[in-house]
Amino acid sequence: MVATTETTNIGKITQIIGPVVDAEFPSGKMPRIYNALRVEGKNAAGQDVAVTCEVQQLLGDNQVRAVSMSSTDGLVRGMEITDTGAPINVPVGKATLGRIFNILGEPVDNQGPVYTAETSPIHRAAPKFTDLDTKPTVFETGIKVIDLLTPYRRGGKIGLFGGAGVGKTVIMMELINNIAINHGGVSVFGGVGERTREGNDLYNEMIESKVINADNLNESKIALVYGQMNEPPGARMRVGLSALTMAEYFRDVNKQDVLLFIDNIFRFVQAGSEVSALLGRMPSAVGYQPTLGTDVGDLQERITSTKEGSITSIQAVYVPADDLTDPAPATTFAHLDGTTVLSRGLASKGIYPAVDPLDSTSTMLQAGIVGEDHYNTARAVQSTLQRYKELQDIIAILGLDELSEEDRLIVDRARKVERFLSQPFFVAEVFTGAPGKYVSLEDTIKGFKMILSGELDDLPEQAFYLVGDIQEAKAKAEKLKQD
């Protein structure tokens, strides 16, 4: 969706190299940087062509260089190109919920047009320092392992690390569900350079788990914006901004707490690198664009809390060749407030969510922010699990009987803690048959303190598996006893 000015400014295409389009405009009527240019007409075969480009460079001699947001197939030199007089605009507001959009804000889900008068440009300045909410506030998710060990910051940015099949999508959907029910918030998902199949699977899973209400889209809790792997680099580079623009409207105008998911932030950087090379810029370290820090900063600095509302962002991060010093993840890490690492080992044990309690980190886990009680409980849980991890080699070689009484007690409690970190999800009800549970932070801390203090040493460890709060674990133990 592109805005147009009343006085039409028309130029002519002079050169096309892949997704890069050069155009000449009349003297004194040059388009601004980031303006959307529109090409509409017929190609040599008589088929309709409609392409939107974004101005990236003013070359001199009345020439501009733009990057196309879709395929340039069918474009020829001499075709008319119109300056819309404004950046790319996308629809915003309640009408976007339950729908899938492309980079231009056009619906691509065969559900008909989007009826909204509200649109916003994808290029905007980050909020002013004076408008920011700088008080560190914990964002309660209702997921025990996250709230206790890697608390999310309201308006913070969290990196989600995990391979295929360990539960990234399910955690994302549960967060979307919980924020909608318990915070009155909404979510926006930006699929940046993701596989078309994955995007389709996510959409269908969200319909199945009622995150998207196919019968009444107004009751949906999420808007989806996709720029898939087969799209030109311009679209993949800008789709994150389109998703962010929709999220900003919910924060600034509707004054809501918003969850913004970006999958994958590495592909955003990769697309920027491709565009940079196409524009003839000298590559920087490892072939990345020289503007890497600026590109990432422009996106990340707009994701923040203001006095009106917050955007809390969960970003999937791919690490090339597991090299954390690669410029792409290294630049991203500088902006993150926490990391949630998913473990295949835990997933293989059937412990879901498979969040690694020892590898995951958060800047919020400080006594001065979360309080002494929360901090001490979290550290005690981690030290118990760490000791259990150290003892596993001895157990594997010599057996449990060779451990001291104290170590046996640690192993017993650690196994209970490990199982109590699991939790039934609302969005997984249709698959597991177990009703989902939202656990408050207060109940989470209370439960783990009781396990570590030894109050529940007489309960079997099965009682702690896939339950909500500690009262439910006690009830399950009673039921197991009767059976």
From Swiss-Prot:
Gene3D superfamilies: 2.40.10.170, Bovine Mitochondrial F1-atpase, Atp Synthase Beta Chain, Chain D, domain 3, P-loop containing nucleotide triphosphate hydrolases. It is a peripheral membrane protein. It holds the Pfam family ATP-synt_VA_C. ATP binds at G162, G163, A164, G165, V166, G167, K168, T169. The keyword Ribonucleoprotein does not apply. Its EC number is 7.1.2.2. InterPro entries: AAA+_ATPase (IPR003593), ATP-synt_VA_C (IPR055190), ATP_synth_F1_bsu (IPR005722), ATPase_a/bsu_AS (IPR020003), ATPase_alpha/beta_chains (IPR050053), ATPase_F1/V1/A1_a/bsu_N (IPR004100), ATPase_F1/V1/A1_a/bsu_N_sf (IPR036121), ATPase_F1/V1/A1_a/bsu_nucl-bd (IPR000194). Produces ATP from ADP in the presence of a proton gradient across the membrane. The catalytic sites are hosted primarily by the beta subunits. NCBIfam families: atpD. This is ATP synthase subunit beta. The gene is atpD.
